[in-house]
């Protein structure tokens, strides 16, 4: 392993693309997932269970299955493509859409659990203190659910960095556009460039370890705080 | 004037409760657990919505059938059974959460509230380190600072241990004495009600059995209160004399004077006495050669059989029965031996040492 391998231009492009994809996906997931998690956490009903099931599907579905359907939906002659006027398949935007759907449960579920654990009381207290529902959501619900939001963001980011099947199906691995880390590792292995594969795989292993450790620490800190 | 009526179903429970109570002072919603007290209180805050009924508080309509003002648009303060402080905020941030959002004129300031409830030393402490009683005081202060026109309290003391309860009761009595706003208090503890409430709403199985001034409700022979073993009469009076040499205070109550142990001053202060029925005995003549300090003329209004061969005698103080109502529980044998009849003038003897005067009420 030499310095030259670490500064490989193709590798840096891949790394930058992966981080960009994960960042955009995480931001979108927090923006979409938080209201969705709130809605799912308030009250019951069959509809909510059906939506919750759909949200959780990517946990059990093989990524290739999800990628296959997304590829069809984003490909030529699909209703979505007709509606948009352009194809999403094999584009960065397509990857973002796929990643958002693929990582949705990893963001929505921890946030939903945090809202459920909070219970209805804090929002009732806020209402009797003249806070409108929106005001109370931002000044009470979000701060109280902070550990869930942080966990969701970390999981969503890490999961997007690590995805393989979906991005390969809908992105194809075009360098600089849709070729992310996991696909690059696969390519290196296929072409017997073991040294480069080692660098990327080792990097991802280290990152995963740090992510899980960070989550445990956050959980421990806020976990004891929440029982006040 | 507070006019309330709520009817509707919640699961298996049917509520149909209506009452009109004065728009000032403390009104207690009293009844066994599961009778719907808390549901009524939640309806008054708008937290629970029952489509049937109305709520008008001192001229402001908060509910008329299905037209229900949401809780955040009502000038209502709510103290929950558990303090429910916001754990992500400091004590002070909790206190001013409602104050920042309050509309209309400032009725009570942060300084007044912290002084009234003794919160000052707590302001800089994290909410996690407060005791149960301290938390509940902060919760009450937080509700008061939202400048409510109506304060609702759902068993604010029931989650506390005896010591915290004794610590917080004097604060509640001070609130009662110094605040103008009406308070609705949910309670299943009669002694708490007797210390704090002016008006009693008696609830049973989702309905209001009766409502009225507490003294009248205690002495009503048609209500279950009169059969309680801990029956007592609540009498309000004014301090008219102090005797420091003997450690006694004299209160002028409607229809008589009562001597009470302790310095209840200053002169002119209003005080509330709780006189247990078992501490009142009856005779035909003023006693001589006795250690009993209080012997007051009274008129027998009626008598009800009580458990354990006893009789509950309803009385009114004063030679012609014009004064406050008083209750006595005596043995059936002595009652029959003396042949007391309704309308008869008697002398009620009160064990002075048994009188308890909650400190610092009135002003």
Curated annotation (Swiss-Prot), chain A:
It is a multi-pass membrane protein. PANTHER family: MOLYBDENUM TRANSPORT SYSTEM PERMEASE, MOLYBDENUM TRANSPORT SYSTEM PERMEASE PROTEIN MODB. Belongs to the binding-protein-dependent transport system permease family. CysTW subfamily. The chain crosses the membrane at residues 21-41, 54-74, 88-108, 133-153, 154-174, 198-218. It is found in: Cell inner membrane. Coiled coil: none annotated. The lineage of its organism: Bacteria, Pseudomonadati, Pseudomonadota, Alphaproteobacteria, Rhodobacterales. Its main location: membrane. GO terms for molecular function: molybdate ion transmembrane transporter activity. Part of the binding-protein-dependent transport system for molybdenum; probably responsible for the translocation of the substrate across the membrane. The keyword Coiled coil does not apply. It comes from the Bacteria. PROSITE patterns: ABC_TM1. Homodimer. This is Molybdenum transport system permease protein ModB. It comes from Rhodobacter capsulatus.
UniProtKB/Swiss-Prot annotation, chain B:
The keyword ATP-binding applies. It is found in: Cell inner membrane. SMART domains: AAA. Its main location: membrane. Residues 1-230 form the ABC transporter domain. The complex is composed of two ATP-binding proteins (ModC), two transmembrane proteins (ModB) and a solute-binding protein (ModA). This is Molybdenum import ATP-binding protein ModC. It comes from Rhodobacter capsulatus. The gene is modC.
